[in-house]
Amino acid sequence: MSARRQELQDRAIVKIAAHLPDLIVYGDFSPERPSVKCFDGVLMFVDISGFTAMTEKFSTAMYMDRGAEQLVEILNYYISAIVEKVLIFGGDILKFAGDALLALWKVERKQLKNIITVVIKCSLEIHGLFEAKEVEEGLDIRVKIGLAAGHITMLVFGDETRNYFLVIGQAVDDVRLAQNMAQMNDVILSPNCWQLCDRSMIEIERIPDQRAVKVSFLKPPPTFNFDEFFAKCMAFMDYYPSGDHKNFLRLACMLESDPELELSLQKYVMEIILKQIDDKQLRGYLSELRPVTIVFVNLMFKEQDKAEVIGSAIQAACVHITSVLKVFRGQINKVFMFDKGCSFLCVFGFPGEKAPDEITHALESAVDIFDFCSQVHKIRTVSIGVASGIVFCGIVGHTVRHEYTVIGQKVNIAARMMMYYPGIVTCDSVTYDGSNLPAYFFKELPKKVMKGVADPGPVYQCLGLNEKVMFGMAYLICNRYEGYPLLGRVREIDYFMSTMKDFLMTNCSRVLMYEGLPGYGKSQVLMEIEYLASQHENHRAVAIALTKISFHQNFYTIQILMANVLGLDTCKHYKERQTNLQNRVKTLLDDKYHCLLNDIFHVQFPVSREMSRMSKIRKQKQLEALFMKILEQTVREERIIFIIDEAQFVDVASWAFIEKLIRSMPIFIVMSLCPFPETPCAAANAIMKNRNTTYITLGTMQPQEIRDKVCVDLSVSSIPRELDSYLVEGSCGIPYYCEELLKNLDHHRILIFQQAEAEEKTNVTWNNLFKYSVKPTEDMYLYTSIAAGQKEACYLTSGVRLKNLSPPASLKEISLVQLDSMSLSHQMLVRCAAIIGLTFTTELLFEILPCWNMKMMIKALATLVESNVFDCFRSSKDLQLALKQNVTTFEVHYRSLSLKSKEGLAYSEEEQLREMEGEVIECRILRFCRPIMQKTAYELWLKDQKKVLHLKCARFLEESAHRCNHCRNRDFIPYHHFIADIRLNTLDMDTVKKMVKSHGFKTEDEVIFSKSEIPRKFKFPENISITETREKILHFFDNVIIKMRTSQDDVIPLESCHCEELLQIVILPLAQHFVALEENNKALYYFLELASAYLILGDNYNAYMYLGEGERLLKSLTNEDSWSQTFEYATFYSLKGEICFNMGQMVLAKKMLRKALKLLNRMFPCNLLSLTFQMHIEKNRLSHFMNQHTQEGSLPGKKLAQLFLQSSCFSLLWKIYSLNFFFHYKYYGRLAAIMQMNTSLETQNNFQIIKAFLDFSLYRHLAGYEGVWFKYEILVMEQLLNLPLKGEAFEIMAYAADALGHIKFLTGHLDLAIELGSRAHKMWSLLRNPNKYHMVLCRLSKPLFLKSRYKHLVQVLGWLWDLSVTEEHIFSKAFFYFVCLDIMLYSGFIYRTFEECLEFIHHNEDNRILKFQSGLLLGLYSCIAVWYARLQEWDNFYKFSNRAKTLVTRRTPTVLYYEGISRYMEGQVLHLQKQIEEQAENAQDSGVELLKALETLVAQNTTGPVFYPRLYHLMAYVCILMGDGHSCDFFLNTALELSETQGNLLEKCWLSMSKEWWYSAPELTGDQWLQTVLSLPSWDKIVSGNVTLQDVQKNKFLMRVNILDNPF
């Protein structure tokens, strides 16, 4: 039975019939229009309250998940219940009108009495439904019902394509009046209905002063059987389902295919409904919350009661309305009788019908309809209401009977304006503002209280759209504000200044044309140009703005320009204009021709006989000749600059005149225009190709300029980074988009304004760890709150998720216009792409497109790329590069382009498309040009459809959701996939085996990483010397490099690591698809993977953000006892701890890591007693592991995941404890280091064991071990020597070489650090892992720098620079500039100039990787501060020193941090010298504090001996400044001894010079360093031999000691 029903429902005729009443489906009408049919019946009018409020609530919802679908579900939940009741009781739903419906029981007159009883019963049951139904969404849904009975006339009208029907007559008027009298839950009978009904069955209540009555209840006699009574009544209903069909609600559900009937019924249904029925792809396509323009037309007739009379009038009006709407893609949605009149509900902007300038078109149509209908003889009054905004457009009703309708406050406002302001065309303020028409087309009307509309806002009368010359009104619309800068348009103004200069010098005409899309700020540019032009003496700037209407007015542009030139714009009366004109033209034009000017300037010169005989063309020529003479005369007296905004609306005659004008005399014309909608006229083309025309295509604003604009618009000193990213991405650099997004945020009260918090005073918690504000450029401070001395900042309301916000209606409309202009197949492609996300790959798009082949898709994509819907990129690096820079302004040379096309060099459109197809095939990554388009297209899908597509995407992506092939397809969190069952695709055994083989995945009882399966063969001799050890280790690494270079196996990866790209195009989208599918555990898995991956890549901010996403999901999980969830919690805290560690928040980090270990069943002791006990246990375990020769069976994946995570936590814990000075903390640190080793040994994984041994070696060296080689380093080498030279072993060896080199650098064995670092560099360069390779280069550069091996250093810096450019690696570039600053400050030559380094810092200090990377930015700021301190430029010093100070508190035990802090301390020491010299009060205290701080750094376990010489050098300088010669001598000698031991030639040379300087204490002039700086040689001079390295060494800064007498 259900299959049969499905088959019936799928028939086109059944689907069409569902949109129509039985009255039409089974009607037999004559073909003539209008046709009239009369019958008797009972009418029910049901009005449902609450839906309009609900529509308003949903249409203003912030988030994208509160859309049309929820609305349609709730609407139909209620309406379908009413429809079902009506159908069960034999009614026929005639019309749905928004949230009301009209039903008919058509019977013979003698049956009316009984049928009224049935209808009353039906009405009471409808009320009963709403008492029983639960109230949803906080809505109070109630119904009011009116009933009427009697004669009814049906009118059918229309044209050859569309038919409409109306029911008219007294009964129709009565039913509406009855419903209007009803209160909530009332049933009102009209007077005639009360007359005709069976009064004995009905208990009523009288209504004062009315003949209508209110039904209380039915009171049948005791013996009355309603079922029998109902069956008898239904026997008289023609189309009530009975017999075999009694289970059907409607007979029309059973219609057999009938092409003739189908064709006839199609005429009653809107075209977009028929499209949806034909195209099954578009199911649910029409239910939307959509910005539209409503035009409500009401016609009142002279003889209301005569069907024949009003029929012909309605027919005439309908035909005209249809023809007008067709031109502008508007549609009639409903026609019904409304308060004694006939109303047409017309809509512009239905799905698929959105067009540009919709509001203007709607007003044009309204005026046209008004003018026509007012002339129809039988129509007494025409009233039209126009309103714009978001309404619900969708199919409302029941499966078997529904209609496409619009519901919303804007529909109500249009209807109310139409009724309360009769006889005119009215519009609301949104329509008025959005029409872009001059204000003089409108007149504001007095406010009226309108039923059902709380506050409609201002109401305007549209006076007509014929352009009237209102002198003085055509100036540029917007005003220039003195206190507001023109942002991001420096280049555009430069074009003007340059062209202006040419104009003044050559005395030739110049035309400057700015083309840009709407919203690019063209008017703002012209306002600035008008201001600049008027600053010059003897210049006259005439500025006008045109509108769409101007184009249709012949010679309008010249008319307005000439009115301004002649000074008529300031005249208040036509007589004044006439006098002015007479004075100006009397010498140029005979008096008898003055009347030529009557029409054009609205004056009243007497009309001469000669003029009356003159033809129209001759008059125009005379007029043009006169204007030329006037302009020639004016040009002699002053320079004229014509400025025309919206020049695409210049009429053809005006273009022709302008073209002649620029050939005839020197004049400067500046225009702004949107791209021409159609091919411009010949004259416009000629101007564009003129050699004196400069044609500029406006670009967008750059990200920093958008940031500045937002800060200036909001008048704040800073905005949150999240807001900055949202606006930069969402606006795409278009000023209007940025403004609309900001307005939307303000409307939803998302922005909070309060005094900016001082960074150093903020108490750090996890939630504000990355409270990251971005600031405008310094030259913008003048326009923000900073200028007033108040640092007001903008913040976001807590809990808001900007990326999920629904786009503002204004921007949504722009996207809908573009979408609706596409073919249906292209729309489908865009909508499918929107599901994938902002960025997508061609492979995934192809996977989810229904029934497409690759050729079709490539062709469609090429077209969409060509039309700027998508951008395409070859790699994610290209994408990231493009996102940093928006499209800039450029010049178009139309003249040279036209010459090329004449030579046949221009491509045809087909060739261009073919070229684009080739480009799309090469580019696998695409991205929406406008994020708003993606959001808009995404919102068009229904929830179920979204789920299906998200599921498809997830299934496709999860196959690649791991590390890249280069990294052996592993998890970012080791063994993570063993813990959680996150796969959607079920795998058979063959697939599993293939995966094991190709990807390295193994079963749960096996592991991914290599094992220590081979027993140890090699051991170092016990008494081997340090030199022999060194030689053996270096020889081993040399052999490994040779093996890597010469191996025939797949030792060297064919491609470099591209994990970062996978994060963007696979793992992040996959996590988001799972969020959309509400698969929270799977989404959490991938967000944790993302956080871990970004930590590996050094991006703490992104790791924090994705961990935040994960935290939201963790809170939603319910299965708290499961091991997988416990592990996810542990991972979450472990990653939190790592982020806190990287940010220098050690207390928070320790807390998080302890939590993670507790969840992993490895409690870390929290008191000395448990510490002692645990230490004993761990030492025994270590001894057991170290003496264990044979390996037991492999561990399960789940166990390994747990051990790896524990090891990671311990690795961070010992570093945290090492930072603390409390003596017992070193025991905690030692325990953590031993526990890391034990955990790693338990994994039986070589890589993990080697990492732990090297970590423990580092711990011991930093804790004070003084030997060159620690025993665990020897154990590492033994492990390495026993590894087979293949696969992952090379990675382990490269890692070991790098780590050993790093340890040797920290401990001051610089030669050894260089030897090991060089070998690590060679290995990592072969292994093609940029993330590891850059770190090796950074580490290698420092010992080379200290050893003064500049040739090798410069070579390493060259590699580092190449890597930073090819990989777009910001960390490498920042480190490169850090070393360049070091070279200038300490080595005495220039590799890159100070200005270049400073510019890099200015451009990148807000980069999220640098800003949240502990140490590097501190080092850069401190180097700049030291530079300025040496030059005694103290203001600049304070600026950078204060920036560095905020980063000092992020104490992390890393080389970069200590590099940074040592330079920061040098800056403070130089400042102390200034304080002492100026005899500042607190100089002595500052000196003592500084010395303590330096001593603390030296005493710290984690600092590393390599930094001691510099720190002792600074301590010596502080002592000499404070007069403590003895201590100075001690620190100086200690530093020299350490430099000698370590081979630190750089520091040794500087120390020797300082010692010599301080001992001899000669006079030193303040500007000596300035002289040194000015003579610093470049590296090229050194290489060429012009400068020797011995000379370079003398370019050291000598710290001034002329404050005290020589203490020595």
Swiss-Prot record:
GO terms for cellular component: apical part of cell; apical plasma membrane; astrocyte end-foot; axon; basal part of cell; central region of growth cone; cytoplasm; cytosol. This is Adenylate cyclase type 10. It catalyses: ATP = 3',5'-cyclic AMP + diphosphate. Keywords: ATP-binding, cAMP biosynthesis, Cell membrane, Cell projection, Cytoplasm, Cytoskeleton, Lyase, Magnesium, Membrane, Metal-binding, Mitochondrion, Nucleotide-binding, Nucleus, Repeat. Activated by manganese or magnesium ions. In the presence of magnesium ions, the enzyme is activated by bicarbonate. Calcium mildly increases the enzyme activity, also in the presence of magnesium ions. Catalyzes the formation of the signaling molecule cAMP. May function as sensor that mediates responses to changes in cellular bicarbonate and CO(2) levels. Has a critical role in mammalian spermatogenesis by producing the cAMP which regulates cAMP-responsive nuclear factors indispensable for sperm maturation in the epididymis. Induces capacitation, the maturational process that sperm undergo prior to fertilization. Involved in ciliary beat regulation. Hydrogencarbonate binds at residues 95, 167, 176, 337. The keyword Nucleus applies. InterPro entries: A/G_cyclase, Adenylate_cyclase_typ10, Nucleotide_cyclase, P-loop_NTPase, TPR-like_helical_dom_sf. Pfam families: Guanylate_cyc. Mg(2+) 2 binds at residues 47-48, 99. Residues 42-179, 293-418 form the Guanylate cyclase domain.
